[in-house]
Amino acid sequence: MTISFANKVAIVTGAGGGLGRAHALYLAKLGAKVVVNDLGGALDGSGGNSEAAEKVVAEIKAAGGTAIANGASVSDDAGVAHLVKQTMDAFGRIDVLIANAGILRDKSFGKMELKDFEAVVNVHLMGTVKPAKAVWEIMKAQGYGRIVVTTSSTGLYGNFGQTNYGAAKMSLIGFMSSLKLEGAK
């Protein structure tokens, strides 16, 4: 069986490196037009520009694929609106959203500031919810759409110094478990 994403458009968040980059490259290899989203900051979410996303786009284009870069924050309403508008303006549809963006601010809970807890939950959870909400009606109107979320065993089993990350990742499991039921209707 041959898998093809020809004529499909995929947004991959957090695609400037790691799993997101791998997802973007593979989807492009299978024929998808890919929107490579990455804020390009440090692992803790500080700093950033679209350079990381642009490098992945260059890799995709060098291999004969089609891609555009987006450096917006997926935890920001205006950033998500720009991401979706840029995708629709460039390609006219959105078939796949891979919500992979994330940051780390590891510290034991007793030493962690609430702002660091909130920042991680905001990027992982709301940085998934906001893009999913933004593409939901587009996908429904098309009669096709797939939303894939990156989670972690830390959400189920925990990991020292990652209460924020574990809470965010477990919440994604609940979010997707409910969303898949709604999407099936």
PLM regions: where:
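Substrate-binding pocket helix/loop in short-chain dehydrogenase/reductase
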Residues: 60, 108-109, 113-121
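A glycine-rich helix->loop->beta "capping" turn
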Residues: 63-66, 86-99, 105, 144
